[in-house]
């Protein structure tokens, strides 16, 4: 594993900010954003170090949520485990897999992540609001349409994996040639 340095700190913090901005830019369209796309691309290129960007994204989301709601909004807590799940799935893709396979798997993982977002969010809802089984099923079924929208949005966003992946690979190769630390 490469040594972590200042350049990496700036790079992965910037990616974390991009994750947050991709969420904000599409705010008017429920559950459509570029977070899954960026998690996939950053993880394909930078592998395990991509988790840093996800943690930065979660911290920015937490701080803005707490500031905007004067400390009374906890909806971001499930992000602590929901987005690392997608990262883990992408980490399971072998480094040497053909790019077409990587893109196909990321598209499937992103779609499933969007479709199952409500299911992954449910444990927090059950604990936070003391939901019984009937209430949990009602909450989950009320959000199915939003999970379907989330899935479709994630799959559509994944059409950008190839150009973003190629761009990041070129930038990383250029960085290696110039020996930036």
Language-model region placement:
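Hydrophobic transmembrane alpha-helices
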Residues: 1-45, 51-52, 59
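Residue-level signature of transmembrane alpha-helical entry/exit and packing/kink sites
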Residues: 4-15, 36, 49, 53, ...
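Hydrophobic alpha-helical transmembrane segments
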Residues: 23-30, 51-57, 91-107, 160
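Membrane-embedded alpha-helical hairpins and interfacial helices in multi-pass inner-membrane proteins
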Residues: 72-77, 92, 99-181
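Transmembrane alpha-helices and membrane-interface helical segments
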Residues: 40-45, 87-92, 163
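Interfacial aromatic-anchored transmembrane helix boundaries in multi-pass membrane proteins
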Residues: 20-33, 58-92
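Juxtamembrane membrane-interface segments at transmembrane alpha-helix termini
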Residues: 46-54, 67-72, 90-97, 118-119
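Residue-level signature of the transmembrane alpha-helical core
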Residues: 13-17, 37, 41, 54-62, ...
């Amino acid at each position: 594993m490469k040594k972590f340095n200042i350049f990496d700190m700036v790079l992965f913090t910037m990616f974390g900010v991009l994750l947050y901005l991709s969420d904000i830019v599409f705010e008017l369209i429920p559950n459509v954003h570029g977070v899954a796309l960026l998690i996939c691309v950053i993880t394909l290129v930078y592998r395990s170090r991509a988790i840093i960007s996800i943690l930065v994204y979660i911290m920015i989301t937490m701080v803005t949520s707490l500031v905007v709601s004067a400390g009374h909004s906890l909806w971001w807590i499930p992000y602590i485990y929901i987005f690392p799940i997608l990262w883990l799935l992408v980490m399971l893709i072998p480094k040497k897999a053909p790019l077409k396979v990587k893109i196909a798997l990321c598209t499937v993982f992103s779609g499933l992540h969007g479709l199952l977002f409500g299911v992954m969010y449910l444990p927090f809802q059950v604990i936070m609001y003391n939901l019984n089984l009937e209430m949990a099923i009602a909450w989950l079924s009320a959000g199915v349409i939003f999970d379907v929208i989330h899935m479709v949005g994630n799959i559509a966003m994944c059409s950008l994996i190839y150009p973003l992946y190629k761009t990041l690979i070129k930038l990383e190769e250029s960085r290696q040639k110039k020996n930036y630390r």
